């Protein structure tokens, strides 16, 4: 069993900075701003070949109000999930009442807890941590997470010994029989070729949209638990939260993202980081659910976000949330507006749901699987070339400078999104209308749904281009006589 380590403490004591150090990523947003982390964030970490799961949490200070109450609940849930807790305090700020309250809660839970004093850079560590002995949690481990000082010592002298006590590493008996068996395996038959199948990989599903359209509510509804903070206030989610899950014997990684507003309205530095994280999550995903608020309709910002999704080549499912409570007349108006403004993406499934009450949510994953399967389906060169030939037979390419564009053959150039590469002569002169015709023909023939198709054209090289023939001596003499004859006739 992989041990779980939770990082807890007051806001802005450096939990996310240490999380990034331990996981060797920049997955957690970091800024000198209390309350930046709002949800539990999970990451894999390793020390001397031993893996453990690290949980970054929001801060607890005992004065929570509004959305901060939900943040504190997430932190308390992380403590329950963890096998061991790293309780972080701020050495510069000194001992605070909230530190004492957290220590009291940890003692009541009887969890293995190690006290970590952060921000000791530039201070005398021994003097900086004296006050924290009053918490009664034993030895204090001084670190400077932002510079990495003391982090390795924390791992080697605290976490590793604890892991050895809880789950000792199995030692291999290195006897003659073991080495003989290993040598026999190495000299035996070669391993069969790896038969890569994208269906065996988890589907990365990003849930995106404008602020407060119900993304986190939908995430919790799908998971069946309050996994992320939900609050009726735009900007509740600030980071992209990656959550592994399984549904109908298929593995997924659910990505709950921060809302994206118009660029002119994004003034807060933290929100700018959040938007970047959301756009990165879109590029990292296989399938994107774009959530639209039925009561506000589709906005220019929705279309802008949609354009980024399509340019990234991601598969798409459109989710119209807050459908409950609307009159039939309003529903018809919303559908007409969607048909008008989203007519250019007729390949994407549209679902009308209520994330709050759960209506329509169960049907989403059928479209997600359909989109992913379409985007990763392997198609042979023979089939693609045959489809291309049928398209040409139904509608010939246009004439360019008196010569008809010739398409020779087609093959797959990539997946997720599907890319079809067509080779031919003068293909760079094909008009956009014919390119769209080919794209739609391939989509219809391959029965592709939920994902964009990209067509790339490659020009056949002319071996005689930019080359001049070298005349033989006989040809040279003949040329001279011809030139002399022309001059005389003049």
UniProtKB/Swiss-Prot annotation:
The keyword ATP-binding does not apply. GTP 1 binds at residues 9-16, 56-60, 118-121. It comes from the Bacteria. One of its GO terms (biological process) is ribosome biogenesis. Pfam families: KH_dom-like, MMR_HSR1. The keyword Hydrolase does not apply. Belongs to the TRAFAC class TrmE-Era-EngA-EngB-Septin-like GTPase superfamily. EngA (Der) GTPase family. This is GTPase Der.
